[in-house]
Design a protein with these regions (language model features):
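TPR alpha-solenoid repeat register
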Residues: 42, 77, 111-112, 145-148
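Conserved structural position within tetratricopeptide repeats
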Residues: 31-34, 65-69, 99-104, 138
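Residue-level recognition of tetratricopeptide repeat
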Residues: 14, 48-49, 83, 118, ...
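Canonical tetratricopeptide repeat
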Residues: 45, 80, 115, 149-151
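Structural signature of tandem alpha-helical TPR/SEL1-like repeats
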Residues: 18-28, 53-66, 88-100, 124-132, ...
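Short coil turns that delineate tetratricopeptide repeat
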Residues: 37, 72, 106-107, 141-143
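Terminal, low-structured helical/coil segments at or just beyond the last alpha-helical repeat
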Residues: 1-3, 130-165
Length: 165
């Protein structure tokens, strides 16, 4: 369920946060919880703000999990949870969230596949990382291709270095 009146406020909060008024943006988002405490998009925005604009990872995780709980088919919180878990070196959990999100309707497949590849790269499973970078390349016709190619090259170099000595 999407609430148009709420989306106006979510956009306002985003603009405040982008303009380095993080406290004001978060305050607006928190106040909206009184109106719609079970709105997945709202919890996703709050989790996004805490994850990328504050050091409070616990709040980010809580709100992203609430977003998924309130709407399990909404893809963005899975992507943000993947990022959060990668930052926390919780790679197994990250892959689980990213795999679930990848299969949601309207998921940004390239972003999910790219993050899954990064997890495998960090776990030093370079073959799997390369496989996911390639899958991401197949899923795009856009600007991401160069970045994904760099990921493949980087994994090949790391694999060569790890196994040549």
């Amino acid at each position: 369920m999407e609430l148009k009146w709420m989306n106006t406020h979510l956009t306002q909060a985003e603009q405040l946060i982008y303009n380095n008024q993080v406290t004001e943006g978060l305050e607006l988002l928190q106040n909206l919880l009184y109106e719609e405490p079970g709105y997945a998009h709202l919890h996703n925005h709050i989790g996004w703000a805490y994850l990328y604009y504050t050091p409070d990872i616990a709040q980010a995780e809580m709100h992203l999990k609430l977003s998924i709980r309130f709407n399990p088919t909404y893809a963005p919180p899975y992507l943000h949870m993947g990022n959060l878990l990668i930052r926390s070196a919780r790679y197994t959990e990250a892959v689980e969230y990213l795999q679930k999100g990848l299969h949601q309707r309207e998921a940004n497949k390239v972003a999910f596949l790219d993050l899954i590849a990064q997890v495998y790269e960090l776990k030093q499973d370079f073959r799997k990382a390369i496989r996911f970078y390639k899958e991401a390349m197949v899923a795009t016709t856009g600007f991401e291709t160069a970045q994904l190619m760099e990921g493949i090259k980087r994994c090949r170099k790391k694999r060569w270095v790890m196994f040549s000595f």
